[in-house]
Amino acid sequence: MVRVPFVTAVTTVFSYGVIFGFGHLRDWFRALLRSLFSGHSPAAAGTNLKGYAPICGGQEDFYYRRFVRRVQDCFWRPIASKPDAWFDVVERYSNDSNKTLHRTTKTSRCLNLGSYNYLGFAAADEYCTPRVIESLKKYSASTCSVRVDGGNTKLHVELEELVARFVGKPAAILFGMGYVTNSAIIPALIGKGGLIISDSLNHNSIVNGARGSGASVQVFQHNNPAHLEEVLREQIAGGQPRTHRRWKKIIVIVEGIYSMEGELCKLPEIVAVCKKYKAYTYLDEAHSIGAVGKTGRGVCELLGVDPADVDIMMGTFTKSFGSCGGYIAASKEIIDHLKHICPAHIYATSMSPPAVQQVISAIEVILGEDGSDRGAKKLAQIRENSNFFRSELEKMGFEVLGDNDSPVMPIMLYNPAKMPAFSRECLRQKVAIVTVSFPATPLLLARARICISASHSREDLIKGLEVISKVGDLVGIKYLPVEHEKTTSAEKLKKIQ
């Protein structure tokens, strides 16, 4: 759990107070002036029609207008190349204080420290790309149908079998979008009379899926098996609300690597608790499958957990495999159940065949079935790159969240003003960084999120470290003690090189 330094917390709250206070004051004056000069209240926000209820309004609209709009040049940045280790970022400008952003014809070649391209498959690949092109010629870009009708190609069946074999489960089912895999599957697995116990920092797709299920939802402290056991015991003893009947079923939902924390799930302990209380385990491996483990099989392999002890395994193809979509792997009984009742499978167009072929080819490379050892080298490279980059950031005095072997490493910024300053200055120095703040994180815990790739060379990483160190000094985000050495940071990095 992040402990915000007292002075940092005070200055951060003060900064938000200034933003919100002056924002409300400006809105009040705007409404007053409009009322005085027009003689009536302004038209509903989001429409030009008087008398209509506002489509856009409330605190969300206020937060966007008074905070997000000021820094929106740090988000939605268009790129003009593949998201490899380096990519082209389109330059933009604004003449109205970021209300509108205009693209230029210029691009900046930047080091990519933001994409989920963990194994480097997002770039052209000697094995994957020719097969993807061939599948495009044979099957076209879309099936134009759902799986139960005309959208079930040979490739879809092959990938389901391959995924099941890769993760160590009897069967699997595919979905066209990773977010939907969680938000649509959870309501298909559990409903009224059931209990979902969710980690407090689970992804929004899990949160929305749990809310939409109709089941009761309880939250346990992040990555805390002891508190999970307390919640389980309390809920089992109390039963369903009002009736106190036994729960129809209990599902505990956790992530393999938490995308905003970079932390590995304490899976062995959580599985032990679930087995003790006869609760199902649902594991979201969106950021861990393909990225960790000796052969890329995720946190189960990394932490020594038998996949048979995890009831439902979810993952996406958007990170390690350079494609799109997601999957659920479980027993054949569960997968058959989902194929017959899950709306996202029955009514949604199936995955694009070239996207399916990309995943098939990527997994074959990881498994060495392409006849080379490139997959093993990629897995060793991302592990080495991740641990090197994390270690150097910590030595520089940055507060870095997460665990070793995780390719996700958040750098704490805290103050809302430091977020755009850090992002803009890094981009100016040709390093593309993702910055995140409320509502994706708690209000006081704004951060930059680094994602490392196997395609990064040591020179790339050193370039990124040099820029991040300089900008960190400029913005003032080195909250921890720096290693005391006589050499400068630049000299130290040259020695490493």
Swiss-Prot record:
Q: Which GO terms describe its cellular component?
A: endoplasmic reticulum membrane; serine palmitoyltransferase complex
Q: Give the reactions, separated by semicolons, that this protein catalyses.
A: L-serine + hexadecanoyl-CoA + H(+) = 3-oxosphinganine + CO2 + CoA
| Cofactor(s) demanded | pyridoxal 5'-phosphate
Annotated TM spans: 4-24
Which top EC class is given? Answer: transferase
The compartments listed are:
Endoplasmic reticulum membrane
N6-(pyridoxal phosphate)lysine modification sites are: K319
Q: What family is this?
A: Belongs to the class-II pyridoxal-phosphate-dependent aminotransferase family.
PANTHER family named among the record's database cross-references: CLASS II AMINOTRANSFERASE/8-AMINO-7-OXONONANOATE SYNTHASE (PTHR13693), LONG CHAIN BASE BIOSYNTHESIS PROTEIN 2B (PTHR13693:SF104)
Its protein name is Long chain base biosynthesis protein 2c
